[in-house]
Amino acid sequence: MKNTVPALVCLLLAACGGGGGGGSSTPATGTTSPTSPTSPTSPTTPTTPVGTSYKVAGLVVGLEASGLVVANNTTDTVTVAKGATSFVFGTQVASGGAYSVTFPSQPGGFQSCSITGATSGTVSADVSLPVICTDAVVSVSTLAGSDTAGYADGTGSAARFGGDPTLAVSGTRLAGLTLDTAGNVYVADSLNSRIRKITTAGIVTTFAGSGVFGSTNGTAATATFSTPAAMVFDAAGNMFVTDTQAHNVRKIATDGTVTTFAGSGIYSSVDGTGIQASFRAPSGIVIDTAGNLYVGDAEAHVIRKITAAGVVTTFAGTTNVAGSADGTGTAASFNDPAGLAIDAAGNLFVADAKNNKIRKITPAGVVTTYAGSGAAGKDDSTTATAATFNVPVNLSIDSDGFLYVADTNSARIRKISPSGKVTTVAGGGIGTDTANAGKDASFVGPTSVVFDKSKTLYVADGNKVRKLVRN
């Protein structure tokens, strides 16, 4: 028998890949050779996936009015609601694409919004722009009238208001303003005993009153007034006028007929219906959505309410008692309440002239102090009741709840924001009449303000009606 063991061992060693230096250098079938490790690759900047796009947005501070519209690249627009703190454009911008943000429409409330920093650029990530809303600079011009008192219809500075220029006047020559639905301005030309009408083009005509001092009813051309102070239209287009020295409230119907709506003409403060009631120098007047009139019965120191049927009651204040107490109804007190404004919720705002305050009355008759510390002054403040006024006599409110105040003795137009911030819109307080921007403008002594739907504020000042618009 042949010796087969060495051959078998050799075969097994070969099958296991073993063997010394004398073994085969070729691996057996089914085995792999070890490989050297690969070197790490150098890091690279990540590439943007094809089709990536980014948001363009804004963070908003201080927006208290409606009407702000922002646009990206002209066509992508967003209307930003008042009180909003952010917005996002609907169309994203592709990576590397351009954005350019503009403001096609600024908000109401004489606010102005702008971007802090760059307004345009290219995108490589989401963009968030800081939008800051502050008080706008306004321009002041004259719509109608001149420095010379008189009486003349005409256009712009050719018109005359204010009566006899030789007459020594301790009070105002022009009083209240109101607007009709077409945007025409009406002014109580007190010392001419007339109601005047001014179109938006500045054309002045006489709306009612013969110019004779009195309280005779009749047609618009023949009726007489005694220092008319303020006016308001009802939904049907009838005008109601507080006829201060006649101590009554007059009505001018749409056909021009003038009648006495409420008040006996006796200097008193008695509730009643129609001419059975009486007033003491009625001043401001507004109307609510139900057709009720509210009157600042200045020298009786109360606010009166007149229903559409002519029923007169005392709504707030203590009759014939001057004071500044807050409270409900007749528990409250005023001191020469003059101009009034009313908001969409039916809250009344009162220019409490001799208290140097703005008061608020809820529909339930609850009276509080809305603005003013009571001290005479011209100080603005972020806290309404810390601000000071100097004989505020008239108010107007816009759709966003901003109040505008004719602060007569400070010769300024003031603004109270819904958050209670009091600022000066226009007027340097130097008691002259110049047409400039904002606080560089000056007034003789503004006596009335009214804000229209196009965001224009009209002011009765001296023998002129002035116009304030955003720069």
Predicted regions and their residues:
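Gly/Pro-rich loop segments of beta-rich domains
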Residues: 137-174, 203-227, 257-283, 311-336, ...
